[in-house]
Design a protein with these regions (language model features):
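A hydrophobic/aromatic-rich effector-binding and dimerization subdomain
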Residues: 1, 49-112, 131-141
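Generic protein-terminus/edge-of-domain signal
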Residues: 1-37, 54-56, 74-79, 88-91
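Short beta-strand or tight-loop elements
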Residues: 13, 46-48, 173
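Preference for bulky hydrophobic residues occupying beta-strand positions
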Residues: 19, 27, 42, 62-64
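Short, surface-exposed helix-loop/turn micro-motifs enriched in polar/charged residues
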Residues: 34, 51, 60, 117-121, ...
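Conserved metal-binding segment of the jelly-roll/cupin
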Residues: 36-49
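Short, Lys/Arg-enriched, Trp-marked, Pro/Gly-tolerant hinge/linker segments that flank
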Residues: 88-96, 111-122, 130-175
Length: 175
């Protein structure tokens, strides 16, 4: 990415991986702030409102639909669904040098270089990444204390969607 490419606030129903190659990136996810430095990574859960600002930063991102990696009726699909249907959110910040960050780095490298069989390597690294997240319990499950934040996120999504749909129109506060 260009060193000054700002990431406007948005959301999507896919996961997103981000790896900072140089500089710093100030990332906001569902109202929580993270400052990423060279080598740090972020895992952005499906449906999370996120955006950020680079500071002399070059970073890579990939968006993916986890359901495409899950085989219908597989043991992994059952474990994944049991966790994420309860509203689990993965811990976004992955520090440089951590096992999860190393897996993300290898994932981007495989996609960039595309060696023979890279498709298998990429999918294998995705499975390892999610296995590591489960192993380390690097996630939280929504509780009643998080409901206020969930409402705030839903309101932000509604506002962003209205802006997106009516971008070319004049919008007033009365609207």
């Amino acid at each position: 990415m260009h060193p000054r490419y700002e990431m406007p606030f948005h959301w999507h129903m896919e996961f997103e991986l981000m790896l900072v190659l140089s500089g710093e990136f100030s990332l906001l996810i569902d109202g929580r702030s993270y400052l990423l430095h060279k080598g740090d990574a972020a895992i952005i859960s499906a449906g999370a409102v996120h955006g950020g600002t680079p500071s002399d930063c070059v970073y890579e991102c990939v968006v993916f639909d986890m359901n495409r990696f899950l085989g219908s009726g597989s043991v992994c699909q059952a474990k994944y669904n049991a966790l994420f249907e309860r509203g689990a959110q993965i811990e976004p910040y992955q520090p440089a040098g951590s096992v999860t960050c190393q897996l993300i780095d290898r994932l981007f490298e495989a996609m960039e270089k595309e060696p023979e069989g890279y498709e298998f390597v990429t999918i294998g690294l995705m499975w390892q990444l999610f296995g590591q997240i489960l192993l380390q319990h690097s996630y939280t499950v929504s509780t009643s204390g998080n409901k206020r934040n969930d409402r705030s996120t839903a309101q932000m999504k509604a506002a962003l969607e209205r802006i997106r749909k009516n971008y070319a129109s004049r919008i007033t506060l009365e609207d």
